[in-house]
Amino acid sequence: MVLLINYAVSLVSAIVVGAVLGMKLSFDMDSFEGSVLFPTPFVAIGLTALIGYLITLDLVSSIIIGIFASVFSKFTNKIFPGVNNDIN
């Protein structure tokens, strides 16, 4: 039960911080731009599972994971720039 609470806290904090950062709420299927609904919750749940497996989880670390996931999703295009298709 505690693990589910940690997942929920991480998920909610990622969505709230993503909304505060000004990310779009809806996502476009033809775009690689991140939004609050994709990939932010999936990054948060994945990081929570990874940290929970490697290290122990508590509420503070779940909140920190949620904040990190939303900031990572916000700046993904700057961290991993796209490929130019210019052949010239």
Curated annotation (Swiss-Prot):
It is a multi-pass membrane protein. The keyword Transmembrane helix applies. It comes from the Archaea. It is found in: Cell membrane. GO terms for cellular component: plasma membrane. The chain crosses the membrane at residues 1-21, 27-47, 49-69. Keywords: Cell membrane, Membrane, Transmembrane, Transmembrane helix. Disulfide bonds: none annotated. InterPro entries: Prd_NiFe_hyd_3_EhaA. Its main location: membrane. Belongs to the EhaA family. One of the integral membrane subunits of multisubunit membrane-bound [NiFe]-hydrogenase eha. Eha is predicted to form large electron transfer complex and might catalyze energy-driven reduction of low-potential redox carriers. Putative multisubunit membrane-bound [NiFe]-hydrogenase eha is composed of at least 20 subunits. This is Probable [NiFe]-hydrogenase-type-3 Eha complex membrane subunit A. The gene is ehaA.
